[in-house]
Amino acid sequence: MTVIDTDKQFPPPLPEGGLRIIPLGGLGAIGRNMTVFEYAGKLLVVDCGVLFPDVEQPGVDLILPDFGPILDRLNDVQAIVLTHGHEDHIGAVPYLLAHKPDIPLVGSQFTLALVEAKLAERRIEPYALTVREGGRERLGPFECEFFAVNHSIPDALAVAIRTPAGLVLHTGDFKMDQLPLDGRITDLAGFARLGGEGVDLLLSDSTNAEIPGFVTPEREIGPVLDSIFAKATGRIIVASFASHVHRVQQVLDSAGEHGRKVAFIGRSMVRNMGIARDLGLLRIPPGLVIALDEATTLPPERIVLMSTGSQGEPMSALGRMASGDHRHITIAPGDTVVLASSLVPGNETAVYRVINRLSRGGATVIHKDVAKVHVSGHAPAGELLYLLNVTRPSNLMPVHGEWRHLRAHARLGVESGVAPDRVVICEDGDVVDLVEGRASVVGRLGSRYVYVDGLAVGDVGESLLTERRILGDGGFISATVVVDSVTGKVVGGPTVSAKGFSDDPDAFNPVIPLITEALGRAALDGIADPHQLQQIVRRTVGRWVNDAYRRRPMIVPTVVEV
């Protein structure tokens, strides 16, 4: 098994006739999925998604893949192939097209509709090529064939990429639900045909590689929702991903059966369900869905609110309801709230905070830990083994997962018969070459997190995030002192103030004489340089704070010369 080498060098030139694969996101964390394929000087991008920040990235809105390795080669990009419409696969498209808006987008009808809605907000009109399962498109030197896969969003596709270097299958996100609500199963027959042809490299979804067995059918959620609706005596609020059309369909069906009207809440929910309805992916009986304004006039027992916010996002519709900040909806006793989604890693604290706030407001909260209101959209180990046995790849590159998922998937590959030295575990920015049927890591281009903070893209770095974490954890202390520019002696102050540290206005009285004493010693030693004096103030305050409070705030010393 090829493992991570921390001393990787810059990659050599791609050998003639070889295929280069560069993952720019999606490895080591679930999100920012983006993979670049290179053949004969041309590039093909598969997916271009975002990662959502966690508590270690305060103030950050989104995290993008690092486009740096391809920014000076955008003219070589033949297309961006999008496997499906989840944000971790399409969310970064507007940021990449901001550099070159005419890069063709290739995807299914629903996927492209979601992307085009995002691009319209930025006044970008893309060149879009709609494909279907069973279709083939030649994109420069890349011959792409598309296969239906079942996932937690309609119209998901896998893509087989053929070049003279070999056949590569990229599954995208998938599972093997044998009874999907839309009747669209993962194309195992097509994958078996590829296996007969000879899959030289398989890139496959690793999210649930640690989980044994097979996925629970989506159909099992319907009866659970029916039971919840039958028992609820007041208003029902269901929170789900804004792209989970199948779950919304189940909610609509249950609402109709129990004589309730449905209102969509949240901008992305309203937009996406409108797109799904227009494309015939969402069946809405006449009169079932109403506007939120009308819903607020009906008795609670006659309405269902279909909302965003299943991941505890504070500014989502459900998040604002939980905190009492929603303009139209106030949580009240008798409400039943259903969180019909999985927990995305890193969101646990936020989700349980929302659950507790809803419970405090009097709502009964039902989530996946207490009822089967959600099933995963990703293949567990049994289905991954099935895929491996059907496709029989010569080389395996696990993608889409944290390190534990990638390694679990790698073990499955070896168990299924892939040679250990043909299983390639990579990290973002690695360079993998497929040459003469063998895939191997040949170097590293590097890849960093690109943070979106408001309108700023890439301006926030790790050092700034460290400062924000220090501010959040320890607060801020400012120490100002005036010194003689010649002797360095204190002639004014010190004054010490703080934010987020203590409410006691006299808390810093003990440190003031310590600063004066330290600067006095410095003056006797002939130290008058303001920068050196600032460091003395910083160290003095820091030692005192550590001794007195065992805290590490941000300390900003200011030395003024007169």
Q: Language-model segments: what does each one mean?
A:
Residues 24, 40, 162, 205-207, ...:
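Structured loops at beta-to-helix junctions and adjacent beta-edge loops in soluble globular domains
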Residues 132, 427, 551-555:
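Short Gly/Ser/Thr- and Asp/Glu-enriched loop/turn motifs at secondary-structure junctions
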Residues 4, 27, 51-55, 76-77, ...:
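A glycine- and charged-residue-rich anion-binding loop/surface
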Residues 210-346, 350-506, 510, 514-526, ...:
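Hard-cation-handling environments
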Residues 2-81, 86-298, 316-330, 349-353:
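His/Asp/Glu-rich metal-coordinating catalytic cores
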Residues 141, 156-158, 302, 474-478, ...:
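Broad gene-expression machinery/nucleic-acid interaction feature
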